[in-house]
Amino acid sequence: MTTSSGSRIGGLLHASLFSLLGLGLLLAGGFKTVERYHFLRTAQEAQGTVSALNAGGSHPQIDFTSVSGERISYPQGGFIFGYQVGEPVRVLYEAGRPAASAIVDDAGALWGTGAFLCGFGALFGIVGFRGLLGLRSSQPTSKGH
């Protein structure tokens, strides 16, 4: 069975796009993970409290007071669930910008985004590279008459 030149080019384009998207997601996930690692090395910590549950509990409202006495309330995002109003939580933040950098000390909040990006990057990359390899192996061979 032969493939037409047009479908071959379309397959090459799709496989290349999946490969590039996968690589981009892997790089973004790696960058996010390294960034988080550096954040944890210098982060301040404070005790906080869950004051409300937003979006069905997947974005709890966290209240805490920084070391400098600033009172902060923010909605925590990320891959987290199961929090209850009034529950104490450990909050990590950068001393110079506590409101913008605060994050609950929870594996899903800390590492979820990086893991998600890397996981989808690997998936897209594998699909793309397998597509490229499949196109390469399906090339007609010339017998040199």
From Swiss-Prot:
The keyword Repeat does not apply. GO terms for cellular component: membrane. Disruption phenotype: Deletion mutant together with deletion of toxin Tse4 leads to a significant loss of fitness advantage when placed in competition with parental strains. It comes from the Bacteria. It is a multi-pass membrane protein. The keyword Kinase does not apply. Keywords: Membrane, Transmembrane, Transmembrane helix. It is found in: Membrane. The chain crosses the membrane at residues 9-29, 109-129. Immunity protein that plays a role in preventing early activation of toxin Tse4. This is Immune protein Tsi4. It comes from Pseudomonas aeruginosa (strain ATCC 15692 / DSM 22644 / CIP 104116 / JCM 14847 / LMG 12228 / 1C / PRS 101 / PAO1).
